[in-house]
Design a protein with these regions (language model features):
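Conserved oxyanion/phosphate-binding beta-strand-loop segments in alpha/beta enzyme cores
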Residues: 1-36, 65-74, 98-105, 209, ...
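N-terminal catalytic cores of NTP/NDP-binding nucleotidyl/phosphoryl-transfer enzymes
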Residues: 25-95, 122-137, 245-246, 313-349, ...
Length: 808
């Protein structure tokens, strides 16, 4: 028959707000559970990526509440920064007006989705009450030498007209607008995240349930390398060039060395060269290239012979010194030793420029003709006293020991991670609370004067320089130290600074005296469950981890990690790319709220595939979830009308067995974030209920009420509106009290969790009966993993009553 979703959903959304659903009392004696979805950029409407995120989060919130937890699940807005400002520019509306209008709209859409949050804790990064404390934390970092201003080659986006952090550049393009990024030398503000390289890497092992791919992405970005550092003297001078290598075992194979065009000795090298014109031209050309262009594997490497020689310290041989733009000044020492026999990039370079190639490692100790670099392990040759040693480890350790003994080198660890560039030449951001005084230099604003307010200006387009530099009343100020005339910093902060600590502010959103209370922070953090997109693995998640460690060392908090458990949802793609406002390919939920209802949309997001997988959006499946809810509506009403009996028959016993199996499987699947299988299990039970109703016209009242209450409670976290309405209409209760418990007498030793793997990795699971066959297990796998092409399966490994693994 169906139901009026518009009327029902509005009714329950109003009820949850009126009854303070989602409001958390931090002082409750219940076990705490901090459940947090990443807060959004309010730069447009909610899209399906948001809907997926907030549906997952709401399922966890409602489930944990019914399991007796004191759940904190707040919501706020990442409302400063490029996304909001660019959207405002496109619409011709001032960023503040645009942002606050979008916040109002997006909040309404979240409520229409049926998600419950503690709106009493709502925060917005652009609010003075919030960015006052962002500025205070910046000053704390500055006073503890964790924030500094310095010259550096930086990534510049001509379209966004601002500097970008390395993490915001994807394959040489701006992550926001896809414009080519080029290099500029500018004086910018940085956070010393590199100081925490070791700890950020080592403490990945202390995290709870984090996806391996996220930890791997952070590990690779931090990029720890172990090796040796030594000096190569420039012949006939007192100058030395330091080089770092991860392959000390190849040091006898050096046939040339390379420095970056920006190397600290580049001027001296040019002066020594007889090839000044070509060198200067090459240096000038390199300055116009982006880092991506310089490192791209697609382009042939270029360089210029300086005509200068350097000495290999291990054997005294002189080799040519080249300049090449594939060497970056801020990686390692800005100089490399080149061993073409055992590095493919060096091999290609040497072949191109006809440089000697000397083999020092061979497969079996015998020399051979090399048509490409030999990079495998082997035996050292042409290496004097080290001949015969095994590469890499044995020979490297011996050569490092010799370098140290001779006083010409040392073992060293280096990291790819560089300091976090936070300066932005944009208007819509948190002002950096620093002042430059002619006498005192850089001076932080006094805490009592915070916030340094972002002025209301109409001309916020930055045609040249920072927009705030044009505002005299903002720029001109007094030095806090000496009182003389001074000027304010006119860059604003990267919006990722705002989001690096927002999860702390939720605990004290209205405090004017402090950003957070350390006692409460230590009680409630780290966040028990964090939910958001995998695309934030390097940016937001790494920055937040740094922030917590820095604030700990300053003495403001005691914790060392912000998020104990992380669920990284897959992206919603549309038209082949991630659905996002910046790409203009969003699909708004409002039409579906109107046509099918929020519950149908929620269920479809949960049913479309494993939530960790990225999926291509199409709306065909939402018809199916709406039909399912219509059947639930009809079945529950029919069941409530079945006349009562004094005892249960075999059909009722079987229905109760099916119900308890479903309780067990749904509970297990929620705990394991396997939401797509929950929907399958609920659909299966609803079909069993339909069959039961066709065959039976009476049922014991206790059993009837148990089936209605427990079935609806299982559905409630996923589709809360219709579940609440059916509970109210049929059992006279407006709220679910507790999560259903399995009655073991119905399922004792009858079921187990079938693990479904693809290439040895768990992709799904299902509660099934003992003795389930391989054929049935395969059928379940096809049902739960529709995105897998089972025609590609090469081998099936089936272990009775345990797992099935498909090798593709």
């Amino acid at each position: 028959m169906g139901y009026d979703h518009k009327k029902i959903e509005k009714k329950w959304q109003d009820y949850w707000i009126k009854e303070n659903f989602g409001i958390c009392d931090l002082d409750s004696k219940k076990a705490k559970f901090y459940n947090l979805c990443m807060y959004p950029y309010p730069s447009g409407d909610l899209h399906m990526g948001h809907i997926r995120n907030y549906t997952l989060g709401d399922v966890i919130t409602r489930y944990k509440l019914l399991n007796g937890f004191n759940v904190l699940s707040p919501m706020g807005w990442d409302s400063f920064g490029l996304p909001a400002e660019n959207a405002a520019i496109q619409t011709g509306v001032h960023p503040r007006e645009f942002t606050e209008t979008r916040i109002e709209k997006m909040k309404l859409q979240i409520i229409q989705l049926g998600s419950i949050y503690d709106w009493n804790r709502e925060i917005a990064a652009h609010s003075e009450d919030y960015y006052k404390w962002t500025q205070a934390l910046f000053i704390n970092l500055y006073e503890n030498d964790l924030a500094y201003k310095g010259d550096a080659p930086v990534n510049w986006c001509d379209s966004c007209k601002t500097v970008l952090a390395n993490e915001q550049v994807v394959e040489g393009l701006c992550e926001r607008c896809d414009s080519t990024v080029r290099q500029e030398n500018l004086n910018q503000w940085f956070f010393r995240i590199s100081k925490y390289s070791d700890e950020l890497l080592d403490s990945l092992d202390t995290l709870g349930d984090w996806p391996d791919r996220v930890k791997s992405m952070q590990e690779n970005w931090i990029g720890k390398s172990s090796g040796a550092e030594f000096d190569m003297e420039i012949v006939d001078t007192n100058l030395k060039i330091s080089v770092f290598t991860t392959r000390p075992d190849t040091i006898f194979g050096i046939t040339f060395a390379v420095v970056s065009p920006e190397h600290e000795l580049i001027n001296e090298i040019v002066d020594l060269s007889t090839n000044k014109k070509d060198l200067n031209q090459y240096i000038a050309d390199a300055s116009t290239k982006s880092e991506f262009e310089r490192l791209s594997s697609k382009d042939e490497k270029t360089g210029v012979d300086t005509g200068v020689k350097v000495t290999n310290p291990i054997n005294g041989k002189e080799v040519p010194l080249w300049i090449a733009d594939y060497v970056l000044v801020n990686y390692g020492t800005g100089a490399i030793m080149a061993v073409p026999a055992h590095d493919q990039r060096d091999f290609d370079f040497a072949k191109k420029y006809k440089i000697d190639i000397v083999q020092v490692i061979s497969r079996d100790g015998n020399l051979e003709r090399l048509d490409e670099a030999y990079i495998e392990e082997g035996i050292l040759v042409n290496s004097e006293q080290f001949n015969g040693l095994k590469s890499h480890k044995e020979a490297s350790n011996s050569i490092i020991d010799w370098l140290k003994k001779e006083g010409i080198g040392k073992d060293l660890e280096t990291f790819r991670l560089r300091d976090w560039l936070i300066s932005r030449q944009r208007y819509w951001g948190c002002p950096i609370p620093m002042i430059e005084c002619p006498s005192c230099g850089l001076v932080p604003e006094e805490y009592i004067n915070l916030p340094v307010k972002l002025p209301e200006i109409e001309d916020y387009l930055n045609n040249e320089g920072s927009p705030l530099s044009k505002v005299d009343e903002f720029v001109k100020t007094k030095c806090p130290k000496c009182g003389s005339e001074a000027t304010r910093e006119t860059d604003t902060m990267d919006t990722f600074v705002d989001s690096s600590w927002y999860y702390m502010r939720y605990l004290f959103p209205n405090s004017n005296d402090f950003p957070f209370d350390s006692k409460t922070i230590n009680e409630w953090l780290p966040v028990d469950q964090y939910i958001g997109g995998v695309e934030h693995a390097i940016l937001h998640l790494l920055y937040s981890r740094f922030f917590v460690k820095a604030l700990r060392d300053i003495g403001l908090i005691d914790i060392s990690e912000p998020f104990q458990n992380l669920f990284a949802q897959g992206m919603i793609n549309f038209g082949g790319s991630k659905m996002s406002k910046s790409k203009g390919n969003i699909v708004s939920p409002e039409a579906y709220f109107d046509s099918h209802g929020a519950d149908s949309l929620r269920l479809y997001h949960l049913f479309m595939g494993p939530p960790s997988d990225s999926v291509e959006w199409n709306d065909r499946g939402i018809e199916g979830t709406r039909r399912f809810l219509n059947k639930v509506w009809d079945n529950v009403h029919l069941l409530s009308e079945v006349k009562p009996s004094s005892t249960d028959n075999d059909d009722t016993e079987n229905l109760l067995i099916e119900l308890n199996k479903t309780i067990k499987s749904v509970s297990n699947d929620i705990e394991n974030f396997e939401f797509n299988t929950i929907v399958s299990d609920l659909m299966k039970f609803n079909n069993s209920l339909s069959d039961y109703l066709k065959a039976n016209n009476d049922i014991c009242k206790e059993s009837r009420d148990s089936v209605i209450a427990n079935f609806l409670c299982l559905l409630y976290p996923l589709a809360p509106h219709i579940s609440s309405e059916l509970l109210d209409l049929n059992l006279g209760s407006r709220e679910f009290d507790v999560w259903p418990k399995v009655n073991e007498k119905y399922i004792l030793d009858k079921t187990f969790e079938l693990v479904i793997q693809v290439n040895g990795k768990k992709r799904a699971s299902k509660i099934v009966e003992y003795g389930t066959s391989e054929e049935s297990s395969t059928a379940f796998a096809k049902e739960l993993l529709p995105q897998i092409n089972f025609e590609d399966v090469k081998k099936v490994i089936f272990i009775d009553n345990k797992l099935i693994n498909f090798v593709i």
